[in-house]
Amino acid sequence: MQVQRAITRNLAKANGYFNKTFKPPTVNYTVRGLKAGVAYLQQNQIRFNPILLQENGQAFIQQVIPHELAHILVFQQFGHVLPHGKEWQMMMEQVLGTSAEVYHTFNTQNVAGQQFAYICACQTHLLSIRLHNAILKNKRQYICKQCKQVLYYKDVLANYSNNTKK
C-alpha cells in the first residue's frame, strides 16, 4: 500500500510539473537478486524486489520508487533517451524532488545468492555465479574499475601459488 501511495504522490508531482496526466504504471514484485527495481518502459510496468523492500522499508520507498518511476515518466515524456541521462536526472531532481542516485546502497546479503571471490591488484571483488560462469567458459574477462587490472579467481591463484612452491 505504501508503494502505491508513493507512486501516486510522485505521479501527481509530474502531472503538475508538466501540466498533463501521465499513465500510471502497473506494479509487481518479481525482481530477484541484487536489483531493487526495474522499469519496463514499453510495458509501462515497474517491478520491485520484495525482499529489499521489506528489509529497507522507508529508504526503499524514498529512493527506489522515484528512481524507477522516473524512467517510466521520462519515456512517456521524451521517448527513448539515455537511461540515467539529463532527462532522467532532471525528472528525479526538479520534478520528483529527490537526488538522482543511480545505484542503491542496501545490504544485499540476503538476496545475493552464491558469490565468488576474485582479486586484482587493489582489492577483492565478489562476483555472481553468472559472471563467474562466463569467465570459466572463457567468454569474458572483467577488469577492476580502480586499478584497471584483470580479475582472477582467488581459488585458482591459491592453487597456482601452492603448485609453484613445490
Curated annotation (Swiss-Prot):
Alphabetized, the UniProt keywords read: Cytoplasm, Metal-binding, Zinc
Q: Main subcellular localization, coarse class?
A: cytoplasm
- This protein's GO CC annotations: cytoplasm
Q: Where is the active site?
A: 68
Q: So which cofactors does this thing need?
A: Zn(2+)
Cofactor: how and how many bound: Binds 1 zinc ion.
Q: What is this protein called?
A: Protein SprT
